[in-house]
């Protein structure tokens, strides 16, 4: 199962080649638009796409105790109740089934979003708006927190690695365009202020990240990689 499959690229390009003996991939995402896109552009005879929410047991219970392998890439940082998500994964897996997770714990994008929200120019626009900054960033959770949680749920932790990754972008333009596209606040900015918002976010990100030795803008994220087994 691919949890948080998005537009389906990982399922087709990564999971199908990685598991040559698989019988079926159930690829699920919370957003119907993502599933529509995946079915149109990344269809495959071995992949079944469905709208489902890993935090809502009722939407996934038809697969409980049937999944041998589960992958969730860059998905769990969006969850409001990560423990519930992990518990639902536990219920999905067969005995001996394994799950792999990769998600952001803390990042300079989160830090920049929090600073933008405090800026008097923008703060009134974002009152009551969900910024989707991960709880792990707010509460400074690290690998030991998740390792304990997963063991308490009943998983055997096979692999747990926390690592800060720094990525450089090819140009200021790419950097300036990319982050507003994944920032939850952008859609709440009036059209006539979009460019000003993009510039302010760009400057705040530069303040958080700086530039690499070649002068290119960069971004840091503290990533967690986990592999667990249901005993």
Describe the function of each predicted region.
Residues 79-80, 93-95:
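Helix-to-beta-strand junctions that scaffold the AdoMet/dcAdoMet cofactor pocket
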Residues 67-82:
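A short SAM/SAH-binding and catalytic strip from SAM-dependent methyltransferases
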Residues 1-60:
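Class I SAM-dependent methyltransferase SAM/SAH-binding core
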Residues 84-89:
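Short, conserved SAM-binding segment of the class I
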Residues 157-215:
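C-terminal helical/coil "lid" or tail adjacent to the Rossmann-like core of SAM-dependent
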Residues 61-65:
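Glycine-rich phosphate-binding loop signature in dinucleotide/nucleotide-binding domains
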Residues 153-154, 177-179, 221-231:
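Core SAM-dependent methyltransferase catalytic element
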Residues 83, 96-170, 186:
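Conserved catalytic/acceptor-binding region of the Class I
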């Amino acid at each position: 199962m691919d949890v948080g499959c998005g537009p389906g690229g990982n399922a087709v390009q990564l999971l199908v080649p990685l598991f040559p003996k698989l019988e079926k991939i159930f690829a699920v995402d919370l957003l119907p638009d993502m599933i529509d896109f995946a079915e149109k552009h990344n269809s495959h005879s071995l992949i079944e796409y469905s709208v489902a929410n890993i935090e809502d047991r009722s939407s996934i219970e038809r697969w409980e105790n049937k999944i041998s392998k589960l992958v969730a890439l860059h998905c769990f940082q969006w969850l409001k109740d990560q423990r519930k998500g992990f518990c639902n994964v536990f219920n999905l897996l067969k005995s001996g089934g394994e799950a792999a997770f990769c998600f952001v714990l803390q990042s300079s994008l989160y830090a920049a979003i929090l600073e933008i929200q405090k800026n008097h120019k923008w703060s009134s626009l974002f009152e009551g708006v969900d910024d989707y900054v991960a709880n792990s960033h707010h509460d400074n959770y690290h690998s030991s927190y998740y390792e304990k949680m997963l063991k308490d749920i009943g998983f055997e932790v096979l692999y747990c690695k926390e690592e800060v990754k720094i990525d450089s972008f090819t140009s200021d333009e790419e950097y300036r365009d990319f982050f507003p596209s994944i920032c939850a606040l952008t859609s709440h900015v009036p059209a006539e202020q979009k460019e000003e918002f993009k510039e302010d976010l760009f400057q705040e990100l530069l303040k958080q990240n700086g530039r690499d030795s070649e002068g290119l803008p960069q971004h840091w994220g503290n990533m967690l990689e986990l592999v667990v087994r249901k005993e």
